[in-house]
Amino acid sequence: MSSGMCPVCGLPKELCICEEVAKEQQRITVKVNRRRYGKEVTVVEGFDASEIDLHELSTYLKSKFACGGTVKGNTVELQGNHLARMKEVLMEKGFSAEQIKN
């Protein structure tokens, strides 16, 4: 298929709603882990990597929270404790409040 077409539904990228439908079906968990030397890492998990572009989401979250981070498997890890604002920011990105669990 051409690069302007969605590989899932076959519609042009401008008309594709596959990612929005995928967002509605996911259960997202947000938690804070302590790593070496007492550093805190916010872990956001529960994404379906085949439906959501995790690297694009990671870039968006890193710019919103002004921190570093990475994508590991189906999780996004951000440096620091961002538990308080994470639900609000994910809702801005199109996820519903019922899907997000702290």
From Swiss-Prot:
One of the GO biological process terms: translation reinitiation
Gene Ontology terms for molecular function: mRNA binding; translation initiation factor activity
PROSITE patterns: SUI1 (PS50296)
Keyword Protein biosynthesis among record annotations: yes
Database matches in CDD domains: YciH_like (cd11567)
Pfam family name, one: SUI1
UniProt keyword annotation of Protein biosynthesis present: yes
InterPro entries: DENR/SUI1_TIF, SUI1, SUI1_arc, SUI1_arc_bac, SUI1_dom_sf
Keywords: Protein biosynthesis, Translation regulation
PANTHER family, per database record: DENSITY-REGULATED PROTEIN (PTHR12789:SF0), DENSITY-REGULATED PROTEIN HOMOLOG (PTHR12789)
Family listed: Belongs to the SUI1 family.
Designated name of the protein: Protein translation factor SUI1 homolog
The species this protein was found in: Methanosarcina barkeri (strain Fusaro / DSM 804)
